Amino acid sequence: SLCAQTRALPVLIVAGLPVVSGAKLYNCAAVVYQGRVLGIVPKTHLPNYGEFYERRWFVPAPDGSCGFVRGYGEGEVPFGRMLFQCEELGEFCFAVELCEDLWAPVAPSAAYAAAGATVIANLSASVETVGKDDYRRALVTGQSGRLVCGYLYANAGEGESTTDLVFSGHSMIAENGSMLAQTGRFEQTMAVSEIDVQRLAFERRRLTTFPDRDVQAFLTVPFSMPPAETKLTRPVPALVFVPPEGSGRDRCCAGILQVQAHGLKKRIDHTGAKTAVVGISGGLDSALALLVCVRAMELLGRPRTDVHAVTMPC
């Protein structure tokens, strides 16, 4: 079994499975760590349109607090919507949602993030249609940005049981609105990256609109995962404020110049200044300042001679 095979591995695994609780059948994700099932999370939003008919078999996740189920390890296992908290790293708190949960108007991940989850894992079986990969990509990156979280999206691929549907295995790792890694469609590969949960926690403290952790209470399941040194696969740019060559740098720089020039244009127009005086030292900063002054005058429809450049001693 999965638990027996992973007992010695310090790896968190999220696996999909059907679970019977009471008289109902649920579409669920089990969180497994070192051979033990930490908890089972049922799917909240069940699609029943187009090619989907999940309500034929399953019922949505029950409202209210977590319950418990038996038969998935020793004793009772938590069942419901919950958080999983790393004891050694307070900023690493994760939660799970399933497929359609992300596509719903109010995703469970929003409540999880408000309650403290910095990483969301999503088990998905998103069918492949023309252009859908772009929409999925926008959903995942957008949700990670809105929630200031890391988002792991694992999609069904080749080998998935199917009739008239096709699954491409398009999987992604996003962080705070940026795509860190993704697999190509119909490729037998994995998406691997690192998520900076401490940076995410800092961003949430900085944003005054991000809610406090006690907005909605969830059962929190602790687990012990001591930090270990690993090889960094995530690229760290030397120029953190400028995109790398060939990935929108020209557009970014043009946008910077446009913002600064329009800001200066407003001040010149508001104060009624007849000229703009800029000191030129020979460095990059003063060169940019001169370009901004020239562009501002162009926006005002005034000649460049209204910019007075004064050379300064080195």
Where are these regions (language model features)?
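Conserved G/P- and acidic residue-centered "switch" motifs that form tight phosphate/ATP-binding loops
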Residues: G283
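Short beta-alpha connecting loops at secondary-structure transitions
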Residues: V307-M312
